[in-house]
Amino acid sequence: MKKAITVVVSAALILCLFAGCGGKSEGPKKVLNVYNWGEYIDKDLLEQFEEETGIKVNYKNYESNEQMYSVLKQGGVSYDVVIPSDYMVARMIDEDMLEPLNLDNIPSYSLINDKLKNPVYDPENKYSIPYMWGTVGIIYDPAKVGEVTSWGALFDKANAGQILMFDNSRDAMGIALKYLGHSPNTTDEAELNEAFELLKQQKSILQGYVMDQIFEKLESGEAAIGPYYAGDYLTMLENNPSLKFCIPEEGSNIFVDAMCILKGAQNKENAEAFINFMNSTEVSAKNSEFIGYTSPNVEVRDVLELSEDAKAVMYPSDEVLSKCEAFTNLPQKTLDYYDSIWIKLKS
């Protein structure tokens, strides 16, 4: 979720990675094909995993849950591990896209915070193990837009030309719904229409609809305010210490990104070894420090080598979290509505 990245891989390279390049066969090789959000892992850990296990990791990125889902549905790719967010895990379970996990091969599951076990999107963690969790908030430059405490700042004409907005319907509608006092998981037609009207009014004051570019534009100062992930805010601060972050008073989206194994994966045991590795305490702590997102491992917070201010962003108070909601998988009728209004909004 995650940090900005642009990935360009030629068709020939994809075929080499996932279909094998020509030449004499040397027999089965230990490989693992991972599909994850951009810049959402410490690449040194991939090398460490390869050294410890002898399993070669082929690694590719996507920008959003919807992009990942679309690529998988189109077929023609052969990934083993994917890392969708909570609501997308539920959708993929419903559509029989995931393999059940053998928790005997994932002993680090015992270190997962009990609050993150047995989630509504995957009871008993039959198909998924939490990878990282976090919150969506507003990142802004107070010198340009003042202090921000509400989602209303993203709809304020005073900030015209400086505002960025998520370029996907679920996140954008979720923000509008929260600002209006509704659940981001509502299926009520009147509430959805109200949020759509708000987004239509906002369109004229936006600098643009973007995803990964939010990171680049806010960090560089090209834009002054936009919604993004708490973990990325900590990274932005390294190059732009004037930025601030807030979880709006109306509440926000709390998300869990989870490691899953795709249905029919050719390297299931390798995938389970990878999942177990990534959730071990030392590895998860190093990964969390690098990407800025919150580990589900209960031992990690105490060993993080980060400032208390950084930890406060990564671990919001119970009071703040009580106002946050996780996205749930919506009925197909509502998903169709989202698709239709997004086409209208972007046209």
Give the predicted meaning of each segment:
Residues 318-347:
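Conserved C-terminal helix/tail region of periplasmic/extracytoplasmic solute-binding proteins
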Residues 1-32, 347:
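Short, low-complexity disordered leader/linker segments with a strong preference
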Residues 27-92, 216:
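Early extracytoplasmic/lumenal segment of secretory-pathway proteins
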Residues 134, 196-201, 239-263:
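Periplasmic-binding protein-like
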Residues 78-222:
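Extracytoplasmic ligand-binding site segments that recognize negatively charged/polar headgroups
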Residues 262-322:
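Mature extracytoplasmic/periplasmic domains
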Residues 88-91, 225-242:
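A ligand-binding cleft/hinge motif common to bilobed small-molecule-binding domains
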Residues 68-69, 89, 214-217, 232-233, ...:
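Short, hydrophobic alpha-helical packing/hinge segments within bilobed ligand-binding/sensory domains
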